[in-house]
Amino acid sequence: MYEPTAPWRGKGERPTIVFGPSTRGQGDQCAPSRAGMQVGSVGLSKVGSPTINVSYEYSFYMMALRRGARVIVADLIGLGMPGHHTYVNHIEEAHALLDAARSGLSLAHAPADAPLGFAGYSQGGGASLSAAEYAESYAPELNVVGTYAGAPPTDLPETMRSIDGSAISHVLGYAINGFAERSPEFRDAVLEEFNPRGIDFLRSAATSCVGDSVLTWGFTDTRRLTRTGESLSEIVERKPVIKETLMRQNLGKQVPNAPVMMASSPHDDLISHDQVRRTAGAYCSMGGTIDFIAAPGTSTIPRTGVDHAVPLYLEMPVGLRYLCLLYTSDAADE
């Protein structure tokens, strides 16, 4: 938790922004709290391989603090603690952010009804959006004012297809490891499909940060990891237990109880613009208050992740301004 020295110049109590971090990895050393000075660190993983942990959003934490907002950053379940990080498990990510909000407000001796918002991009966007969905049922005492979610992976099977063969294809191993830890049926259904190289893929994922993954497993086609030569997406389609596990995490099924800004670049090469737009439309159809932004971005080399990463730095400042406006005035007018 970061407590600002700058005064809050808006109305009422100092607000709090809970950040869901973007993909850091699955190894314990990848946790946001493990980054040196909360910025980044280089070292060795549990298995002795070089590893790097970078806080992509650090400048945005500072931006929020300069505005006088309190900042809380959640490690998410399994990062820096026993067990696999349950990557893109939206239900657990929602609980992690909401619990972090509760704990942070208590630690700061802030009123339980102090204004609160969520922010994140990519994995963090999904975590923030899921927290917005579950706030009313899981933490109704919290005064959630709004959420900013950039490039959230709202449809996991669709995201799997676009990630496969990309620079960050190893993150599929993070997801499989996490879901396998929660469901023996899922674990058995998946593991019987992998060849020895596929098993190495999963074992390596368990101790890797995302930079390590790009260097060691970047652009891996999952057809090279399975016994049958099928892609993971093809296996998902023929194995109901796997598909149902992933579909259970899809977002857009329940309306957030506060305004949400969603942003996605039409050129995003990892998390499709269409899935984010569809989810925004689903919320609108349920009566949600949604601002959807077709974010500016780049169109460079497909599947490298560049066109996914650039909008983070273009749109997060807009999202933070949106949250600060929600704290101080009528969001619809602003």
Where are the predicted features?
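Short, surface-exposed "cap/lid" segments of acyl-processing enzymes
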Residues: 8-63
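Conserved small/polar residues in nucleotide/adenosyl-binding loops
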Residues: 327-334
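Alpha/beta-hydrolase active-site loop
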Residues: 87-107
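Catalytic histidine neighborhood in serine/cysteine hydrolases
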Residues: 284-302
